Amino acid sequence: CGDCPSCRRGEEHLCTPGRGLGTVAPGGFADHVMVPHPRYLFDKGDVSDSLASTYACSGLTAYSALKKVGPLTEGDEVVLIGAGGVGMMALQIALAQGIQPIVVDIDENKLATAKELGAKAVFNSGDKTTVKQIKQLTGGVAYAAIDFVGAEASVNYGMACLRKGGKIIIVGLYGGALNIPLPFIPMSARIIQGTYVGSLQEMGELMELVRAGKIAPIRIEERPLDQVTQALADLKAGRVQGRVVLRG
């Protein structure tokens, strides 16, 4: 809207009235969109249209989540939970920024891909001993965990990986509830933070990295727009690696 406190702070993605296409307003699967102002346009350089479209969605979401981790010092470890499209994008962006995260998922194929791309280590969260293994690898516990699943089990897993004063950043929208004894929060000094997409400034920063060739492209699969129902079903079933791009 441009007028609410969030918009005035440059956080238009958190606009109080909200006008997001495909969420608040219809039009998420439209083949054309009217852009109301040039500030919403970004130079994609030589990147293909299909790949560039992923940066404005999963790319921006992953970049903003990583920024919320804040400055890291020697020995600070970051755990990425969920190696789907957004998680893989976060891995690529993290590597471009000199961060080598640990990746966690329940899919061995996705974990193998994450390891090939450069993850420091990968762990299957279906194995209940992996939290202990992460603690051994990190010399204690991790500083930050970013949860790209957003389920009760994944958040609890991330919390178990954190040291005192660490933070968990929740991106995923799977659902469920988190039951934590309130004294645990101040006594552990841990931070639980949500994040949703990202700001225009962050989008500009991300595209600078993209144009400079610092972010390796993730796997994308193009499908015609009339296959949207099947694409959503494949996403829900976990059959998609990387991102699906619909073409009208």
Q: What positions do the PLM features span?
A:
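A general structural signal for well-ordered alpha-helical segments in protein cores
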Residues: 1, 29-30, 41, 59-62, ...
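NAD(P)H dinucleotide-binding glycine-rich loop of Rossmann-like/cofactor-binding domains
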Residues: 1-81
